[in-house]
């Protein structure tokens, strides 16, 4: 164990046995990540919780009584915060969450293990929502291939799918938040969001690793919803 340039103790993991270098580096990063440690102390399910906390503290998306949809919810960090801030724990708001993976129960959160790409997923989600939503948020990430251009297109495609769903279920004035990555492949997506929402911005919370191109697109003030049919 050694100190880094900030004076914090830095845990180093030895490579041995069947452990690959990539696994060693991932484990070492997790052990030395202050947000991972803080999440454990605070009782949150993931470090991603702090990303939503920072974004919502600044832009005030989540308010008591709201209905929120959390796409790609597992392990549940965002759903925890959303349920608390909209009052779902007390039955005043609603949080609907889906993910390909299982997710442990969270008070005030209705969860379904669903593939968002599945043809019947939007209809099932609408049934769970039972009306229109105030916020649709997505922390989904596409599987990577290692080919940069292909990965960028996959990521943008996933955000486009989430944005399309948001356009179908959001109330006028609603908000859409989605994880994306810095690239030149999202110009068309951003143009569409700017037509559909009053304000569109990119945000990079402090909890996003600085060596990552990860960022979030936040669109607020949804302009549609009045004429769209909700099945």
UniProtKB/Swiss-Prot annotation:
- Which keywords annotate this record? Cytoplasm, Methyltransferase, rRNA processing, S-adenosyl-L-methionine, Transferase
Native species of this protein? Bradyrhizobium sp. (strain ORS 278)
Question: What Gene3D superfamilies does this protein map onto?
Answer: Vaccinia Virus protein VP39
Q: What class of enzyme is it?
A: transferase
User: What PANTHER family does its record include?
Assistant: RIBOSOMAL RNA METHYLTRANSFERASE, RRNA METHYLTRANSFERASE 2, MITOCHONDRIAL
Q: Which reaction does it catalyse?
A: uridine(2552) in 23S rRNA + S-adenosyl-L-methionine = 2'-O-methyluridine(2552) in 23S rRNA + S-adenosyl-L-homocysteine + H(+)
Where, in this chain's numbering, is S-adenosyl-L-methionine bound?
A: 76, 78, 99, 115, 139
Q: What gene codes for this chain? A: rlmE
Protein family per UniProt: Belongs to the class I-like SAM-binding methyltransferase superfamily. RNA methyltransferase RlmE family.
Question: Could you name the Gene Ontology cellular component terms for this entry?
Answer: cytoplasm
Q: What does this protein do?
A: Specifically methylates the uridine in position 2552 of 23S rRNA at the 2'-O position of the ribose in the fully assembled 50S ribosomal subunit.
Catalytic positions are: 179 (proton acceptor)
**UniProt GO molecular function:** rRNA (uridine-2'-O-)-methyltransferase activity
Localized where? Answer: Cytoplasm
Q: What are the EC numbers?
A: 2.1.1.166
Q: Know the name of this protein?
A: Ribosomal RNA large subunit methyltransferase E
